[in-house]
Swiss-Prot record:
It catalyses: a ubiquinone + NADH + 5 H(+)(in) = a ubiquinol + NAD(+) + 4 H(+)(out). It is found in: Mitochondrion inner membrane. PANTHER family: NADH DEHYDROGENASE SUBUNIT 1, NADH-UBIQUINONE OXIDOREDUCTASE CHAIN 1. It comes from Phoca vitulina (Harbor seal). The chain crosses the membrane at residues 2-22, 70-90, 100-120, 147-167, 171-191, 223-243, 253-273, 294-314. It holds the Pfam family NADHdh. Core subunit of the mitochondrial membrane respiratory chain NADH dehydrogenase (Complex I) that is believed to belong to the minimal assembly required for catalysis. Complex I functions in the transfer of electrons from NADH to the respiratory chain. The immediate electron acceptor for the enzyme is believed to be ubiquinone. This is NADH-ubiquinone oxidoreductase chain 1. Belongs to the complex I subunit 1 family. Its main location: mitochondrion.
């Protein structure tokens, strides 16, 4: 039974990821005053299926000088971790209702760094290694602010369980009292998922395509699926933290519609940002975090710790 539950979670995720690639190409197309994919199937709807068939039927080439085990393990680990992070998400009921769901998701996103590092190192290519080192430095750096912002939100939530965020936001979305945190969170999620304008790992002019440059066919598709699954997952997380959907136990489908619309809006905002902004320079990327975001998030975290003490003489409730 548990396996059926897992499969019923994985298949919709993979379908959502497949069609997100189509939505991205369509959105970018219309923003550049062109049509986007429109040949394969009606309105190009079968394009992701055609892409998947093409990628998974190609021969997966492996460089002679690469480290075989790590080279093969890296994309499998990337996709496995990307799918595992969906387990505690309440939509409206999670697959496993964890007491420390937030910590579990932070731990999984930290482990994803290893798949990037292994792929860059095992490829035995200088471009892949430089891309991987950039990605790792960027991901680890932005996780610092993500963790501090999460701590601030959890102080308002009063629990590490994700489901209680729905109850916390019944009367007021947390984006209103904590809008600076929400803005920094959104920018940090862009950096965490290696999306434009923070896609330094894929600098075409200097690094070809980054840490996955030596990958082809199936393993490349697995990295691709992992990246887009992480994008949707991060937007779901943002919706949970700051745009809590109203949940009526007697009509859970209303929650699902509300939740999906907000997640879709945030995902299209990701694509809109990609179409609008040029890439950051690497030093600007690091300065933004260590010199701007970190002091601000620390100050706001202290504010959220001291507020209940000063206003109600009670310690923070977590």
């Amino acid at each position: 039974m548990f396996m059926i539950n897992i499969i019923s979670l994985i298949i919709p995720i993979l379908l959502a990821v497949a069609f997100l690639t189509l939505v991205e190409r369509k959105v970018l197309g219309y923003m550049q005053l062109r049509k986007g994919p429109n040949i394969v199937g009606p309105y190009g709807l079968l394009q992701p299926i055609a892409d998947a068939v093409k990628l998974f039927t190609k021969e997966p080439l492996r460089p002679l000088t690469s480290s075989t085990t790590m080279f093969i393990m890296a994309p499998i680990l990337a996709l496995a971790l990307a799918l595992t992070m969906w387990v505690p998400l309440p939509m409206p009921y999670p697959l496993i209702n964890m007491n420390l769901g937030v910590l579990f998701m932070l731990a999984m996103s930290s482990l994803a760094v290893y798949s990037i590092l292994w792929s860059g190192w095992a490829s035995n290519s200088k471009y892949a290694l430089i891309g991987a080192l950039r990605a790792v430095a960027q991901t680890i750096s932005y996780e610092v602010t993500l963790a501090i912002i999460l701590l601030s939100v959890l102080l308002m939530n009063g629990s590490f369980t994700l489901s209680t965020l729905i109850i916390t936001q019944e009367h007021l979305w947390l984006i209103f009292p904590a809008w600076p945190l929400a803005m920094m969170w959104f920018i940090s999620t862009l950096a965490e998922t290696n999306r434009a304008p923070f896609d330094l790992t894929e600098g075409e002019s200097e690094l070809v395509s980054g840490f996955n440059v030596e990958y082809a066919a199936g393993p490349f598709a697995m990295f691709f699926l992992a990246e887009y699954a992480n994008i949707i997952m991060m937007n779901i997380f943002t919706t949970l933290l700051f745009f809590g959907a109203f949940h009526n136990p007697y009509m859970p489908e209303l929650y699902v519609i509300n939740f999906t619309v907000k997640t879709l809006a945030l995902t299209i905002l990701f694509l809109w940002i990609r179409a609008s902004y040029p890439r950051f320079r690497y030093d600007q990327l690091m300065h933004l975090l260590w010199k701007n975001f970190l002091p601000l998030t620390l100050a706001l975290c202290m504010w959220h710790v001291t507020l209940p003490i000063t206003s109600a003489s009670i310690p923070p409730q977590t």
